[in-house]
Every structure is written in structure tokens, then in C-alpha cells.
Amino acid sequence: MAGLINFEDEQEVKQFLDNLGVEYSYQCYREKDPEGCHRLADYLEGVKKNYESTAQVLQHNCEVNAHAQSCYKLGAYHVTGKGGMKKCLKTAYSCFLKSCNTQGKKSVDACHNVGLLAQDGRALETGPDTTVARQYFEKACEGGFAPSCFNLSTLYIQGFPGLDKSMPLALKYALKACDLGHVWGCANASRMYKLGDGTDKDEQRAEELKNRAKDLHGQEKERQLKFGE
């Protein structure tokens, strides 16, 4: 059938991929399309394995177009120093913050990373900041990012300067993490109901959450097995 690529023909595939690169470059630099720029970055990274060029496109698309997904990936490049980018957690923090506040693809993940870096403190001049960490974990949790809900729960279990210990809030976020499929959110919530920590004791609810944790753990193991096949 005309128009279909014969993926068994190495030369035809190479020509097809080269044409994609030209098309994405045109979208990015001639049409000024931020999505085209991100497609170009994905192409350079995934097809060409040219991480230096990828980093340059990501930087352009983040700084000029404030593209959330490109800012997120640029932040990840700065965390590891990939593609010739300076390995710098402060710069990574700025990229993640920009992505988080832009509210596009990967913005929720970026908000979570802002929370992690604020909690760790190495990206901030003033050191660890639990207040900022909580703020961005809350933003990511509201966006349905389970690890942020779980992290909020652990923050309230422990208590930190500027964040009072609160077992009812710890339970609230553990339950939300559980609802979003986080194994340890379910496990922690189960234990709280079993002990009556932050809530009245409820053996039945504790058992339900324990079984939910077991089911999620089993699903994770099954996914890992399938991935390894």
C-alpha cells in the first residue's frame, strides 16, 4: 500500500527518520511551535542519541517558550549533568519550579521534585525548607501524584520546624496516596486505624487497607515479571 513505510528496509527507515528530524526542526525554529521543539528534543534524544543537542533544544524551549515538559526534562539534565549541562541542583530546582508553575505535561512531577529539593535543602541558599516542601507536595498531591501525598503523610507523622506533627493530617494524606495506588500509603493508613493513631481504632478498616496494600504489591510484582519477560 502506497505511503506505508517498509520497516524491514533499513535505508527507507533511515530516510523516514531523517525526514522526521527535518520536520521537527522546521516546526521548532521556523513555525516557532513549542510542541514541535519538544518533539525535536525527543527525536534528538531517542533516535539520534545526541544528548548535547537535546539539551540545547530543551534549554531553548524552556527559556523562550516556557514549555512545561521541556523545563521538566531540562531540570533532570541539570540534576545529572547530562548533555553537557552543568550539574547543578539550584538550576534544576529553577527548571522544575518553572515547569510546575506553567501547568502542562509533567508539571505535577515537577512540583513533586521542587518539594523533594526543598526538603533536601541542597538547592536552596537557606537549606532545608519544610514549608516550601509541603506547599509543592500539596500542589502535586492535588494533581493526583501519589508519591507527594505519601510524602505529606510522612511529614505530618514526623513533624518539622514550621510544620507541626498531626496524625489526623498524616492519615488524610496516607489515605489519598492509597486511593491513588501507593502501597505504603495503604500500609501506613492501615496501621493508623489498627492503633487508633489520628483516628478511632477500626480493625475492619485496618484490614481493608492492609488487603489493598497486598493487592497493590502483587500488581507491582506482576508488572515487574511481565517487564522482564
UniProtKB/Swiss-Prot annotation:
Cellular localisation: Mitochondrion intermembrane space
Pfam families on file: Sel1
Keywords for this protein: Mitochondrion, Repeat
Claim: RNA-binding is one of the keywords in the record: no
SUPFAM superfamilies: HCP-like
Gene Ontology cellular component terms for the protein in this record: mitochondrial intermembrane space
Annotated region (Disordered), positions in chain: 197-229
Sel1-like repeat ranges per the UniProt record: 34-66, 68-104, 108-145, 146-182, 183-218
Keyword Mitochondrion: yes
InterPro entries documented for this protein: HcpB-like, Sel1-like, TPR-like_helical_dom_sf
Gene3D superfamilies: Tetratricopeptide repeat domain
Function field: May be required for assembly of mitochondrial respiratory chain complexes.
Family (UniProt): Belongs to the hcp beta-lactamase family.
Record protein name field: Cytochrome c oxidase assembly factor 7
Species: Danio rerio (Zebrafish)
Gene: coa7
